[in-house]
Amino acid sequence: MTTAFYPGSFDPITNGHVDVLVQALNVAEKVIVAIGIHPGKAPLFSFDERAELIRLSLAQALPGKTGDITVVAFDNLVVDAARAHGATLLIRGLRDGTDLDYEMQMAGMNRAMAPDIQTIFLPAGTASRPITATLVRQIAAMGGDVSAFVPPAVLQALTSKRPN
């Protein structure tokens, strides 16, 4: 069984992330969505909230396939976390050339540290290319409509975080 490891902050999960996850299930039988925990950062959503939003979003997008996806936390090197979960593929989504430049550097370093783990780049669909979790958080915080960029569960969670 091929296991893929999809690391990110997912703060929050966006339609772009969901798009990449749908594609990832075409190249791996199992996908581990790995939420990075970084002590110096203050995410909008806690790990538990992010994990639940991922589960709810995927249940809607992939009915019947969520058993092939596991959500975990990690706070170490991506390749070490992937290896600990038995993954042989790293999944990375690409929106544009800027992402490609950065991700190629990361893939090279990961390959040097873990030649047994391959990085797979999955292109974002046209509709999800402009979406970033950072922009979603900023727009939502200012009362903007982010419904086109996030799954319904995330929209509801963002709305509940907005000050009245």
From Swiss-Prot:
Protein species of origin: Rhizobium etli (strain CIAT 652)
Role noted for this protein: Reversibly transfers an adenylyl group from ATP to 4'-phosphopantetheine, yielding dephospho-CoA (dPCoA) and pyrophosphate.
Subcellular location: Cytoplasm
Record protein name field: Phosphopantetheine adenylyltransferase
GO-annotated biological processes: coenzyme A biosynthetic process
Family membership: Belongs to the bacterial CoaD family.
Top-level EC class: transferase
SUPFAM superfamilies, per database record: Nucleotidylyl transferase (SSF52374)
